[in-house]
Amino acid sequence: KVGTFKGSINPNTENFTEFKKFINKNLKDFKNKKIALFCTGGIRCEKASSYMIKKGFMDVNQLKGGVIDYLSKIPKKNSSWVGECFVFDNRVSVIHELKQGTYELCHACRNPINKKDKSSPKYVKGISCPDCFGKISAKKKKALNERNKQIQISKSKGLYNPYLKYTPSDLY
């Protein structure tokens, strides 16, 4: 959803179990072809490539250091990367030179959201986004409203709140 390499195949999976199913169902004809895997930091690629090799794939490669390393070293003009890269911290996404991206997290489902998502009638700040709208219980909506109040109190008093947007360098 956030970014990818030009020409890559998106398995549209949310976890490793789904990825295994995708491989077994969709990549049978790729066992003798060159395969390049990429992920944010390279860790999940280790697991995926190991699984693929066990399943008989002959030429499985990984992007060393992951997309993060690639974006930090390859200038945008020479890059095959399209979009932003999801990261697992409060930055949410980064672009080339590891500059802050434009995505934020939906407070309800924790999925990345962009300007288009936020312009949807299904987006309610701190409550829902197009991905989770209509899936949130009344109890959770009440809790999310309370969290929003606490965030605003923290913000107005200049206090730390884990839901405010900080980068690691802001904290040290």
Predicted regions and their residues:
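Rhodanese-like catalytic fold shared by cysteine-dependent sulfurtransferases
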Residues: 1-35, 43-172
